[in-house]
Amino acid sequence: MPSWTELINQLEAQPNDQQKNAWLIGNFDASLQNISKLRNNRNVLFYGSAFLQKPTAPQILLQITHEEVNGFMSVIHGMDCSKGLTLIMHTPGGVTNATETIVSYLRSKFSDIEVIVPTFAMSAGTMISLAADRIIMGRQSQLGPIDPQMPAGGRIVSAIAILDQFERAKKEISEDRDQAHLWAPILPSLGPA
């Protein structure tokens, strides 16, 4: 198997964009077919996001959303579902109820599902992985937290941590009303309300 640098060099050796696209598609298809053969002729599906290459892109364009439900249905239509599914995942996560719908759909179609995580299957990707019969990971592979995450103060934080912070504020203020002055600048940053 070639290294990342070798693949980039092979791609760059193509003389024009049309041949680069043909090289990419041809090698991608050949790789999926090779994985299928290695996995006893299972159906192989790749779900990936360019979230590492496009960090400034809006998250909604890079994560699992309700649109992916139709994508999964379209790709799976016509597959011999008795062969099982090998799902290769690379995702930062996404919308929880969209993930639940995808898992329900996959489970309704395949009696045996395995997930390969080459690098990242975070958050909602972790949920899909945990719903599989098997997860195949390398040394560098990572799963992520599955608790709800929310934007707060320009960063993503655990919704449970926000609730815990509110409970702490409530307790401290109910025990000593003067604590309200200390919590006043903090509380607006904890939630969307």
Stretch-by-stretch model annotation:
Residues 1-120, 126-193:
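Terminal-region recognition feature
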